[in-house]
């Protein structure tokens, strides 16, 4: 997998965490750079850890389903991307927002480490599934998870900083964009591995 694809996947995966970071930034009474760094480290760390776990699982079964790798990547990324889009347009409040709001007390909002761990896990489950597909795509897993973690950290830091001003609007658009990006990457991988365009043109 080329570097551009890894970066795009990283951005797509980070959109869910970005959306929650915006929510956190909007609910914290006084947003500081140190708080943004702390939130970014939690989300970036888990977003890097989950693909590694998924990759480890996928490696164990590589010999059995290597011939289906492109289908696995397409299906996983499409399901994840579709879920992100669906979650962003449904009317009910997102569950991750409910977790964050449960820790709100009056105007001064509490965002302790336990809260961040719960939110980081909730927003990195998709990365676990993507990690499984990495096992069949010949990627450098260490470089990949470093990129994913770093991009997520930066994006979440930015999300916290701007959450106060444009939280709700940007949250929805970020999740939709992330979903579309993941679906397109899945289609790209499928086309490359099957060389299907050569049969059409």
UniProtKB/Swiss-Prot annotation:
<protein>
    <recommendedName>
        <fullName>Putative manganese efflux pump MntP 2</fullName>
    </recommendedName>
</protein>
<feature type="transmembrane region" description="Helical">
    <location>
        <begin position="39"/>
        <end position="59"/>
    </location>
</feature>
<keyword id="KW-1133">Transmembrane helix</keyword>
<feature type="transmembrane region" description="Helical">
    <location>
        <begin position="3"/>
        <end position="23"/>
    </location>
</feature>
<keyword id="KW-0812">Transmembrane</keyword>
<keyword id="KW-0406">Ion transport</keyword>
<feature type="transmembrane region" description="Helical">
    <location>
        <begin position="65"/>
        <end position="85"/>
    </location>
</feature>
<keyword id="KW-1003">Cell membrane</keyword>
<feature type="transmembrane region" description="Helical">
    <location>
        <begin position="176"/>
        <end position="196"/>
    </location>
</feature>
<feature type="transmembrane region" description="Helical">
    <location>
        <begin position="141"/>
        <end position="161"/>
    </location>
</feature>
<keyword id="KW-0464">Manganese</keyword>
<dbReference type="InterPro" id="IPR003810">
    <property type="entry name" value="Mntp/YtaF"/>
</dbReference>
<comment type="similarity">
    <text>Belongs to the MntP (TC 9.B.29) family.</text>
</comment>
<dbReference type="Pfam" id="PF02659">
    <property type="entry name" value="Mntp"/>
</dbReference>
<dbReference type="InterPro" id="IPR022929">
    <property type="entry name" value="Put_MntP"/>
</dbReference>
<dbReference type="GO" id="GO:0005886">
    <property type="term" value="C:plasma membrane"/>
</dbReference>
<dbReference type="InterPro" id="IPR036259">
    <property type="entry name" value="MFS_trans_sf"/>
</dbReference>
<keyword id="KW-0813">Transport</keyword>
<comment type="function">
    <text>Probably functions as a manganese efflux pump.</text>
</comment>
<dbReference type="GO" id="GO:0005384">
    <property type="term" value="F:manganese ion transmembrane transporter activity"/>
</dbReference>
<feature type="transmembrane region" description="Helical">
    <location>
        <begin position="116"/>
        <end position="136"/>
    </location>
</feature>
<keyword id="KW-0472">Membrane</keyword>
């Amino acid at each position: 997998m080329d570097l551009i694809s890894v970066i795009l996947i990283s951005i797509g995966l980070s959109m869910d965490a970005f959306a929650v970071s915006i929510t956190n930034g909007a609910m914290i009474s006084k947003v500081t750079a140190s708080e943004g760094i702390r939130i970014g480290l939690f989300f970036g760390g888990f977003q890097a850890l989950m693909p590694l776990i998924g990759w480890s699982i996928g490696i164990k079964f590589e010999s059995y389903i290597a011939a289906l790798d492109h289908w696995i990547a397409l299906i996983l990324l499409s399901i994840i991307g579709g879920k992100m889009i669906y979650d962003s347009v449904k009317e009910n409040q997102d569950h991750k927002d409910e977790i964050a709001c449960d820790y709100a007390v009056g105007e001064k909002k509490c965002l302790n480490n336990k809260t961040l761990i719960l939110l980081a896990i909730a927003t990195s489950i998709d990365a676990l599934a993507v990690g499984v597909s990495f096992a069949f795509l010949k990627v450098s897993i260490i470089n990949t998870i470093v990129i994913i973690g770093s991009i997520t950290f930066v994006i979440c830091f930015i999300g916290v900083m701007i959450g106060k001003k444009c939280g709700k609007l940007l949250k929805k658009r970020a999740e939709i964009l992330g979903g579309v990006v993941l679906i397109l990457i899945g289609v790209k991988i499928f086309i490359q591995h099957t060389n299907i365009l050569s049969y059409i043109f």
